[in-house]
Amino acid sequence: MTRVLLALVLLVAGAVSAEPPRAALGFRADLVREARAVWGLQAPVPVFAAQVHQESAWRVDARSPVGAEGLAQFMPLTGVWMTELYPAALGRDAQPFNPQWALRAMVRYDAWLHARVVGHTACDRFWAMLRAYNGGLGHWQAESRFAFDRGDRVSVDRWCGVARRAAVHCRENLDYPRRILTQHQVRYAAWGVQVTCDG
């Protein structure tokens, strides 16, 4: 009886932890709308929600020690650059602490990166996109040039810290897509189409 009760408690605890945090719920409609406007009706909204989860834990006022700001943790110069790329959608002033602006800019930046990376599978390509968002497209491109197979994330990931990026940054950069695609995304499964990965 004790084992059955313990199993039930663990099952319930697991189900609760797999839910989106309360802070995320108020942004769901905005994120779905912004993602579908850029990516279409089959937009992988759970990926984007998991990305915000990883970046800021849905804190509008989040500020990193290195200067990244807001829900999507844009660095100030990246935010300004986004307004130059997409002035009609984002206006002339970067507003990283405005949640609607941050979500709108993030899905556009993700699409911009997605168009510049390769992958044999959706997982490989989104993995590369997320690594580029976290650590810079130039670093990912340098690593992919060394890789035996540019479309395979494992082949590219092996070159982290060898090609151009300092090895000290590899753990965070390689963990970033793994957490988003294999841990956090499941919390947001009800929000839309997921990108499945084997781990």
Language-model features and meaning:
Residues M1-V4:
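Positively charged n-region of N-terminal signal peptides that target proteins for export
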Residues A7-A18:
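Hydrophobic h-region of N-terminal signal peptides that target proteins for export
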